[in-house]
Every structure is written in structure tokens, then in C-alpha cells.
Amino acid sequence: QYGAKCVFIKHETKPMSSSDIRDMLPNRRGASYLPESVYARIIKNGDYDAKPELYWLRDKAYAMLSPKRVAHVVGCEAEAVTLANRWGEDPENAAEAGILHDITKKLVLSDQLILCRKYGIINDNAEEENVKLLHAKTGAALARDLFNISDEVYDAIRWHTTGKPDMTLLEKIIYMADYIEPNRDFDGVDKLRKLAYENLDEAMALGLEMSLEDIRSYGQEPYYATADAYKWYSDHTAQKQ
């Protein structure tokens, strides 16, 4: 009647309501029902108490890594989940921290410092000159900005390089998973792996001691947080014996 030309497009629909999707989001589901940009914004803002689906989070994290680093992160996530199941930690939090712990590792010092200024990160003189120290702090801050991670996951990323005295269970799991994941190959790693599943605090003491010895073997002075962490875990485990 009006000269219109109608085109019928065949498209498979999914029976779904907005309330169904809102119910999915806190349970790490729903990404496939939303446009990528919408889902990313929901995760960033923490809308509807959303938690990121782990496959989606992996894609985002791996895009920020070198190919060699991806293999390490895959191993770290798997090790973190296994340790979490062994010691009674939430395996999804362990997976999330494992996936995200190195997202700024490939950035050069100048880019690390740009992120520090952006997120208001205060550093001491040693940190200002050391990418290895900075990436734990900038990685935690960037992960919180992009993915609205919990305080527990933030702290696990924040302390995964140096350690610190009296760490939470999740912090210890990520520190140890980073150290002993299957791609790691160094003298003593098998002993450390075994101990991590028998006595996590003793494994922390041994791992921190090995880290201090490695740093000193290069003629460098260990960062104070690592030395403090070793003293705490060494004293703590000695008191229990």
C-alpha cells in the first residue's frame, strides 16, 4: 500500500529477560547474552554485583601479556586453583588473581610510573627504579580499575612479588603459585612444590629464603618487604615446632 520493501532477517533468538541476566552476573555468567562493550562496562563499574566470567577475563588479561608470559599465567592460575582447593580458599578468587597478577609486567619503567601517577601510587626510591617491584602495585591498581576486583584479590596481586609479614591465605596462595607453577624450573622447586601442599607457612619461609639468596647472588640488596616477610615466616614456623 505504501510502497515499502520489507526484508525478513533470519536470526536465532534466545529466550531471556533482563532480570535473568542480572541474576546471572554475580555468578560469573551472562557475558554471552550481552554486547562486549556493555559487559565490559558492567564489570568495570561492578553493576548488579557482577563478577567477570573467567574465560572472558583470560582473554582480556592475555592480550596484555607477551606470549611467554601467557604460558606462565596459565600455569599460575592452575596452580593457584589447586592450592586453593587444598587449603580451603575460594578457587574462583584464586583463579581471578592468578589470571590478573602480571597484567602490567611487560610495561617499561616509564609506563609503570605513568600508571603510578594515574592511580596515586606512592613509591619509595627502590620501587621507582624497579619494574619487578612496580608491576605488582600497578597490576593490582589496573585490575581494580578495569575489572572491579575485590580487596582480597587486589591485595593478593599487590603482594605476589615481595611478600610481606602475616599474609592472608589468598595472598600466600598467589605468591606460592607464582613461584612453583609447572613452568618454573630451578634448583629446589620440586621440594618447594611438595612443601606447599604439606605446610603452606613453611613453604613461604623456604620460598622467601630462596628468593633472598637469589637476589644476593646477583650482588643486590633484597627489598625490605621480602626480608621482613622471611623473618616473620621463619619466626612463625619456628614457634610452631
Model-derived regions: residue spans:
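Generic secondary-structure signature for well-ordered alpha-helical cores
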Residues: 26, 85, 162, 213-220
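Short helix/strand-capping connector loops at secondary-structure junctions
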Residues: 17-27, 190-191, 207-216
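Charged phosphate-binding loop/patch that engages nucleotide di/tri-phosphates or the phosphate backbone
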Residues: 30-54, 213-241
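Divalent metal-dependent catalytic cores for phosphoryl transfer on phosphate-bearing substrates
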Residues: 59-64, 72, 81-208
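Classical nucleotidyltransferase
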Residues: 1-52
